[in-house]
Amino acid sequence: RLMSDGHPTGLLAAPSPTDTAAASLGEMTSLPLTKVKPPALPEKLVARARLTQRIDRPVTFVNAPSGFGKTTLLNEWRQGCGMPVAWVALNADDDHPLRFWSTVVTALQTVDPSLGQSWLSQLHSSSPSTLSEIVVNLTNDIIRASDAPNAHHRIGLVLDDYHHIQHPGIHTSLQTWLEHIPPTLKLVVA
């Protein structure tokens, strides 16, 4: 199976300057910053300390039906966890590997602008990279950033509304990331 740029599914390559796909790459990687900003908490909030305390593992999956307050719970946890947290509000538009990982990197850069630099250089290189290689480089960026002077030793990442993601390449690359998740990253998927 081939992507629209002619590469096999699961591979990313930066388009050449003459490639008409360059415009679609720009459209795919540009996104409103509201996607990486957590929603405001309601004024009248029922605190759920017992639930927020359960979000303590390196990776936490929150599963509940729509309307049960997952987003509010994660936002409450974010405000009280004591570390900077990047936020991704996913929707059906993010169900493409390039768009998904671009959004994740943009969110992480709200916490630390140096995160994702290797990823960006791979994206714009002339040779295609597998999603696995890109995810490994993102992991390495997070580890290097946490070792830098004055760096946050731990950061969080919330992937909210992950149920919109159906693309097998995203699931596979996220699984690869989970296998190599840096100890300084706390990932919450809802």
Task: Annotate each predicted stretch with a short phrase.
Residues 12, 66-68, 72-155, 164-166:
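Conserved phosphate-binding/catalytic loops and adjacent sensor/switch elements of nucleotide-binding enzymes
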Residues 160-161:
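Walker B catalytic acidic pair
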Residues 59, 164-169, 175-190:
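Sensor-1/coupling segment of RecA-like P-loop NTPase cores
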Residues 52, 139, 171-175:
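A short, noncatalytic alpha-helical element within ATPase nucleotide-binding/catalytic domains
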Residues 62:
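Hydrophobic anchor at the beta1->P-loop junction of P-loop NTPases
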Residues 87, 157, 187-189:
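Structural beta-sheet core signal
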Residues 2-25:
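Interdomain "pre-motor" coupling segment immediately N-terminal to P-loop NTPase/helicase cores
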Residues 17-54, 117-123:
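Conserved adenine-nucleotide phosphate-binding loops and their immediately adjacent elements
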